[in-house]
Amino acid sequence: MRIWHLLCHSGGFFPLPRLVVDKTTQKMGISDSLQEELVYRKDFAEQGIRLVAERLAAQTEFTGAPGQQFSYCNDGFGVLSDIVRRYSGYDSFAEYVEQKILQPLGMTRSNLGFLRNSLDENAAILYSKESGLWRADRNYENDAFVLHGGGAMKSTLADLMRYVSMYLRGGVSEGGTRILSRAGIREMMLPRQQVKPGVTYGYGLQRSQMGVRTLVGHGGSLPGVSSQILLCPEAGIAVVFLCNTMDVPAAAAAESCMRAWCGEPVRYKAPVLPECAWSEEQRQKLVGTYASGEGDHFTIIEEKQELFVQTEGGKRLLHAVGDWKGLVQGTYGEIWLQPVRTDAGEVRAAQYGTRTFPKESGIDNDMDRAAKLRF
């Protein structure tokens, strides 16, 4: 495996249960404080990479060989952030980000911390749903990953506009400071892996088309957070969307804003689907429950020779759109399904959206199911 495999989520790892900050600090007998923040502590960083690396090294089953298939993996970007910590010359990943990115760009309200934001009265209250009930708090440590490259940045609209403007300027800040080479920007945006037809993933950025224009961006979600940045290099504009509520369609909102500005149709238009049907063999082999170590799952069921995807949000028709390819039409876009098959033709997993889900095979329904399957 190489670094570029992790940069484009093709290391071959299934989604695994999240290793979180609060449980790790409890086991270590330490806590966050303004005097000694976790994001700068060497012992916490080393414990985090130890836990993640040991778990990844223990995996015996994979989505495919490195570089073969896209499957979003926060663990991979966590490992990347620790590589930066070890080899950048800085004591922590947080310090590197501050010195090399935030300060040169003038992003004075952005940081990777936890407690400082929870105590900040000018920080957003986070609205999240747990066990069917809404909660409102400033718990910026809630479900936070132990390695900060997996999604720890807290920012503002103004700061993120400075960040996305750097891409539009070819790697240069508003003040003229070079943050990244023009070649580096281009490498980040080049397509490396297919997410679904018409959508690819580069080095930390997703790429799609809006007519003849290119759209490049990325989203993020946590309890109480829905976010999206979106760039159109040809038009020289960018959209930043931040919301302090979970499960908001941030990507759809950002793209609608971009389309409106560029004079494109704003509303989502469902694609014209080919006239295909699932064969009896395909229906038999696809039916079953697919479960991710992150806790998400879906079930493919058959009714009257048609397939449906059942999730917590309801049941939707799984359209056949090609050889062993399926599509679910959602409110704001399509979710593509691509099964992973063995040499014998058996379905043992499926990429659904951005994740690859192992198919359950009569094993115990626990959080380690991804590591128990055989491919």
Regions found by a protein language model. Name each.
Residues 131, 234-235, 344:
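Residue-level recognition of short loop/turn positions
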Residues 217, 228-245, 348-351:
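Short, well-ordered beta-strand elements
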Residues 219, 242-246, 295, 303:
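Histidine- and/or cysteine-centered catalytic micro-motif in compact active-site loops
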